[in-house]
């Protein structure tokens, strides 16, 4: 059986990156929540 996590930098950035988060309203909500919480890293 193949493992579920097959690392790829491109896929990681395209789905979880900053610009991907900024594209949608929900993604911007995620970023603002992480800013409010004081996260050092907002996105991948």
Curated annotation (Swiss-Prot):
Region (Disordered): 22-44
Source organism of the structure: Methylococcus capsulatus (strain ATCC 33009 / NCIMB 11132 / Bath)
Recorded name of the encoding gene: rpmH
Protein name in the entry: Large ribosomal subunit protein bL34
UniProt cross-references to PROSITE patterns, sorted A to Z: RIBOSOMAL_L34
Biased composition regions of type Basic residues, renumbered to the chain: 34-44
Keywords: Ribonucleoprotein, Ribosomal protein
Family matches, as InterPro entries: Ribosomal_bL34 (IPR000271), Ribosomal_bL34_CS (IPR020939)
Gene Ontology CC terms: ribonucleoprotein complex; ribosome
Ribosomal protein found in the keyword field: yes
Transmembrane segments: none
Domain of life: Bacteria
GO MF terms, alphabetically ordered: structural constituent of ribosome
Residues of the signal peptide: none
GO biological process, one term: translation
Family: Belongs to the bacterial ribosomal protein bL34 family.
Gene3D superfamilies noted in UniProt: 1.10.287.3980
UniProt xrefs under Pfam families: Ribosomal_L34 (PF00468)
